[in-house]
Amino acid sequence: MTAVTPDDLTISPRRIEFELPDPLPRYWHGGDPFKTHFFNAMSLLFPDGERFFIDSVRYFRDRVKDPRQQQLIKGFIGQEGHHSREHIEYNRRLEAQGYDVTALTEPVRRRIRYANAHFSPERRLAA
């Protein structure tokens, strides 16, 4: 496989931490219910989606011989792993507000399980 990664690309894991007020206001995004629920929904999707992407990349990691590509893979996995942990914590806060997080995330998990069972590693990586 030929790499087409730009020479100047680097992925440095950023340790972004959400600075959430405690308690988290119901409509935390400027008091706007729409914006709040939009970002809540995104946060609910991210941990499982990020894990899917990490697993898809990790499957091929040992086949990559280029040290630079290996560093990019390591950076990607580190970045997504940290990002996912932040969303998991945020989602716990939503659960504390009374949201049924499992009911909202289970359909995504079912689709990911289906993709893992029915799609080749190459196809999952292409996602």
Question: What does each model-identified segment do?
Answer:
Residues T2-A127:
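Non-heme di-metal
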